[in-house]
Curated annotation (Swiss-Prot):
Its cofactor is Mg(2+). It comes from Staphylococcus aureus (strain bovine RF122 / ET3-1). The gene is cca. This is CCA-adding enzyme. Mg(2+) binds at D41, D43. Pfam families: PolyA_pol, PolyA_pol_RNAbd, tRNA_NucTran2_2. Catalyzes the addition and repair of the essential 3'-terminal CCA sequence in tRNAs without using a nucleic acid template. Adds these three nucleotides in the order of C, C, and A to the tRNA nucleotide-73, using CTP and ATP as substrates and producing inorganic pyrophosphate. tRNA 3'-terminal CCA addition is required both for tRNA processing and repair. Also involved in tRNA surveillance by mediating tandem CCA addition to generate a CCACCA at the 3' terminus of unstable tRNAs. While stable tRNAs receive only 3'-terminal CCA, unstable tRNAs are marked with CCACCA and rapidly degraded. Its EC number is 2.7.7.72.
Length: 400
């Protein structure tokens, strides 16, 4: 089992211990270590206060000092070091009104969300598992630490995180945990949509997404999310992992809607991808010739095209017409892309200025149309991408 990331962080824990404090690995890295999965981020918990951590290490960043978290920079890596803490009453089902620093590991672990995430480990790889997290991991069960209703009342996002973990790990959800989710799911309306979107993005890429997505529907989670609340999400089916952006595009195409995406507070890149997914899905059923395929591959992001093609079963499950597989498939997409004479308009050897000078014409609506005609002619092989050849073609084929 790969311990390299733990070993890279070991000097931090040892330095904290050398100064008379406790320090442990904690959270997802320990869970994944117990499961034999690849480890990514290392989180450290300690009895030292943020001020004490800052006095021990020369290079620190107070990313969340008021909540007990200090980033320690070691060997050009950032390590999140958080003081043992007990959280005060939560407000709005999403954040504690304050935190109290404590010196006891048990008290820190009992505030965490799920038993599998409430295991600590020392530098000798000894596990501190007060809530039977290893047993739940072995039984492939997601269970809250303590009373589920209390954990979800503290932070409603834990319910979406639970479904995300189910999707990623293919675990079952403990009965009492699931029943608390059924009772309290409406509380996610108090959450920021940004936090929900982060979890949904991971959930949609999980290997067990079909089950988790069906739980989102049965628990009526979508009823309490901006954008989705206006839609009958029970009509949407997800049978395999897809991007969240593709899901939103599928919803738009299936219901033939053009709702504003602003309530989801997505990045400009995400919005651009969603709009292009919609255009691709609408264009796919109309491609029957190699010439049409060339224009299609030229016009759209081939990575997004491939994502849609890989998700063909999801489109079918939502009654969205797919592509003609003999003309449009992963191989023909790659071959067509490879042989395109140019990949965007910037590659074209003429521009609007050249055209206006050649035709002795002023700018107007005609210019955009002619540039598009030239693009298509080059992409489909009717004219080579050379200025003299293009202008000859314009003289013979274009009227303004």
């Amino acid at each position: 089992m790969d311990k390299s990331l733990f070993e890279q962080a070991r000097p931090i824990l040892e330095q904290i211990q050398d100064n008379g404090f406790e320090a442990y690995y904690v959270g997802g890295s320990v869970r994944d270590y117990v499961m034999g999965r690849n480890i990514h981020d290392i989180d450290i918990t300690t009895s030292a206060t943020p001020d004490e951590i800052e006095s021990i290490f020369s290079h620190t960043i107070p990313v969340g000092k008021e909540h007990g978290t200090i980033n320690v920079v070691f060997n050009n890596e950032n390590y999140e070091v958080t003081t043992f803490r007990a959280e005060e009453d939560y407000v709005d089902h999403r954040r504690p009104s304050g935190v109290t620093f404590v010196r006891d590991l048990y008290e820190d672990l009992q505030r965490r969300d799920f038993t599998m995430n409430a295991i600590a480990m020392d530098t000798a790889y000894k596990l501190y598992d007060y809530f039977d997290g290893q047993q739940d991991i072995n039984n492939r069960i997601i269970r809250t630490v303590g009373i589920a209703a209390e954990r979800f009342q503290e932070d409603a996002l834990r319910m979406i995180r639970c479904l995300r973990f189910q999707s990623q790990l293919s675990f079952e959800i403990a009965t009492e945990t699931f029943e608390a989710m059924r009772t309290q799911m409406a509380d996610i309306k108090f959450l920021s949509i940004e936090r929900i979107v982060i979890e949904l993005t991971k959930l949609m890429r999980g290997i067990n997404v079909e089950k988790s997505f069906n739980h989102l529907k049965s628990l009526k989670a979508f009823n309490y999310m901006p954008y989705f609340e206006h839609l009958d999400m029970n009509q949407i089916n997800v049978t395999e992992p897809i991007d969240l952006e593709l899901l939103i595009a599928i919803v738009s195409v299936k219901f033939d809607i053009n709702y504003s995406l602003k309530p989801l507070k997505l990045s400009n890149r995400q919005v651009k991808d969603i709009n292009q997914y919609i255009q691709i899905m609408n264009a796919l059923p109309s491609i029957f010739t190699k010439e049409q395929l060339k224009i299609f591959v030229y016009d759209y992001d081939t990575n997004l095209i491939k994502n849609i093609m890989v998700a063909a079963d999801v489109l079918k499950a939502n009654d969205i017409q797919g592509h003609e597989p003999l003309i449009v498939n992963l191989q023909t997409i790659d071959e067509t892309l490879h042989h395109l004479p140019m990949h965007n308009r910037k590659d074209m050897m003429v521009n609007g200025g050249v055209l206006m000078a050649h035709l002795n014409a002023k700018s107007g609506p005609w210019l955009k149309d002619v540039l598009r005609q030239i693009e298509i002619a080059i992409v489909t092989g009717k004219v080579s991408n050379e200025e003299t050849e293009i202008l000859k073609w314009v003289d013979n084929h274009v009227k303004i």
